[in-house]
Amino acid sequence: MSNVYQLGLGDKKVSIRLPERAKARVLVPDYSPALVDVAAAVRKALTQPYGRPLDDLVRGLKRVLVIVPDRTRVAGLKEYLPVLTKFLADCGLGPEVVQILVANGMHQLAGREGLPEFLPRSVLDGLPVSEHDCHDKTAHFLAGKSSRGNSIYLNKKVAEAELVILTGSIGLHYFAGFRGGRKAVLPGVASFDTICTNHRLTLRSGEGFHPKCRNASLDGNPVNEEMLEVLRMIPPAFVLNTITDAAGKILRVFAGDSVKAHLAGCEALKRDVTVRVPAKADFVIVSCGGYPRDSTMVQSHKAIDNMAPILKDGSPMILLAENRHGMGSDELLGWFDEGGVAGIRRKLSSKYTFHGHTALSLSEKAARFKIYMVSSFEDDVVRRMGLTPAKTVEEAVTDVLSANAGDLTTYVFPEGSETLPVLEEEKGAAAS
């Protein structure tokens, strides 16, 4: 007797067959139903926001900047952005006033040919659109210095605006606590050095990662605190954030004050994605949730990070992650040649980069667990990261079951990048 499960891998669904002895339990977020009328929900959020309505804020303005997420984010952009831009047009703000800036952070630029993949055609044809390049020093201005000494360089278009509208989705983030809100600015439209200095706050000298720099953690999180500081350095900001399911369907919309609206969304998401488990697992199978959540290794490794607290040390994990856009950084793979966890940590303490951080996080998990990865990578690339390559899920499952006799406590996560599993006794501390 066996059970069959369907998990996402890129744009496809793959079947996984597990025997009864695996004692598999499927764990998914408890999302609210998808919105039937997204346009109506967005308009309501804009006119009844947390704080002043958007039509009141934009009255008489000559320069409005709309910051949107890049192609790595599932945000429902093609649904909500046309509603937002029409709302602005109805307020008398057209292409001579409104422009779009893609918040790439340190991610790869999409290029003109890649923009239609995630931006609606009506916006591309109707408004000026540009991409933020964190490496283009001529495109940045000094907004100020944070209390921790970080020189905050941002895209000049922010300084030129009278109002900045921050859009995107709210989701878990493995060291900033949550995506959305303030992250559209830092790291979204910040310079490379500014981003690296902010992200370096995740490390404590000689002690590894800061304990507050983790999923669903905002209070006392130095990365988040500096991001909030930056909001006070820029023109007035209005947020439009969504919560989506793995298919990209919009479930909720939050708008208004850049702090209050985002916090309300974080609280709602936390309730949705936190799942209880009675004990640590002997075996975990996790999908990122398909494309674009498994678009690059930078994105895919977040699913591993989410699972680590509820898997027994030394136990197997199977990760389904297509990684069609590769590593997500030209430098990431080289970090795995630094001599394991200790070597990466040494180099990172003297020369911090975000991708070194990712390499350290992944290497720590690879040292604790046996992680199989089903992906589009060549086997040698997977092994270089300390992971075990598998051509198919069946191959990985067979290997795990043959190496582990008897019953197993198995958890299956179809939406691992957006699921926060916690042990039942730790449930109350999940959002501290």
Regions found by a protein language model. Give the residues of each.
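C-terminal catalytic subdomain
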Residues: 294-372
